[in-house]
Amino acid sequence: IADEWEHSTNERRMFRVIASLYAQLDLGEIYKPLKGLRYRLNFGPDFRYRRNGTFRDKESTSSQGQNHASNANNSNVSWTLDNLIYYNREFGQHSLGLTLLESATKYRKENASLAANGIPYEPSMWNALDKSQISQLADWSTDLVERQLLSYMVRLNYGFADKYLLTVSGRWDGASQLAEGHKWAFFPSAALGWNINQEDFLKDVNWISQLKLRRNAFGSDPSSRNPKTF
């Protein structure tokens, strides 16, 4: 029985670059009437490349008397870009917070693989899969997956005396993987909060540091559906 370890080679390589970048601008520091207004930019790129090369010489029990080689390449590129505007102010016992968001996400994955028999020059292994040099093309495939998501969001927070809280938001999501005519959807949400520990009848109760009652109502996000495959 031939030793397969001596007659086969498998090499995998991977390269990845991932980052999280942001920039922020306090407009109130530049122009006093805009106190409480801030702008923030978030950018998160992610790049991955993988290559898997396999070679089995003609002495391998699975090569059927021919040198066999395969080469598979995979690249993934994705990024997310967020534009955010914040506005926060207090007026006496009233507090107001406004958040505006525009977010774009893109994902792209490409796959390509090739396998052949009859490699004439063994040291080249999977690096010379030229149709003029090989005797038989055994297998090949290509694949492309893409998806995009674009979102807009508005959120309003209101508080009174640090006791009673209201949050109202609306989000518009557009997803490329959804069917034509159904790519965009609106998702509203609302929440009421009550900081009970701030009430006079609990202020002297030392063993309660925080007690909050919250009620939410919100929609769902369909953008997690399968991406489009070409």
Model-inferred region functions:
Residues 19-27, 81-87, 100, 154-158, ...:
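Residues on the lipid-exposed face of transmembrane beta-strands in outer-membrane beta-barrel proteins
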Residues 4-10, 64-72, 138-142, 173-179:
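Extracellular loop and loop/strand-boundary signature of outer-membrane beta-barrel proteins
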Residues 13-19, 77-81, 148-152, 182-188, ...:
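Residues that define the transmembrane beta-barrel architecture of outer-membrane proteins
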Residues 43-51, 102-108, 141, 170-176, ...:
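Transmembrane beta-strands of outer-membrane beta-barrel pores
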Residues 21, 39-43, 98-100, 168, ...:
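Membrane-embedded beta-strand positions of outer-membrane beta-barrel proteins
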Residues 1-28, 131-155, 159-161, 165-169:
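Outer-membrane beta-barrel transmembrane strand signature
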